[in-house]
Amino acid sequence: MTKGTITSHDISDFKGGWFIGDFNPSLLKTKDFEVSVKTHPKGEIWDKHYHKIATEYNYVMEGAVEIDGVIYKKGDLFVIHPEFVVDPNFLEDCSIMCVKTPSVVGDKYVVKRWRS
């Protein structure tokens, strides 16, 4: 009889908070989806970007973020569909859990910011 185990991992051992998906290192290597937990300080400048294929399911665990004029706060869920350009404004220190499907390496397209 084999007994189960629990393994412990440090999120800092994974690239950018992404710990499940079709990349290394990964706790579960799969092309089906990706999972991350990220913490963003208030005012952090994040890449303005979009995904051609993937859909992101996001849950705000702490803080507040504004995307496209809508403020998402602790407890809010929001879905970002393919080809929607995201330019987040972190209004407070913010922690977000993201599930992205499918897991497609290279499916992030950065959009240049134009200054007036």
Where are these regions (language model features)?
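Short, conserved beta-strand element in jelly-roll/cupin
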Residues: 39-40, 50-66, 99
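A short, N-terminal "cap"/entry segment at the start of jelly-roll beta-barrel domains
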Residues: 1-34, 47, 113-116
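Ligand-binding loop in jelly-roll beta-barrel domains
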Residues: 71, 82-112
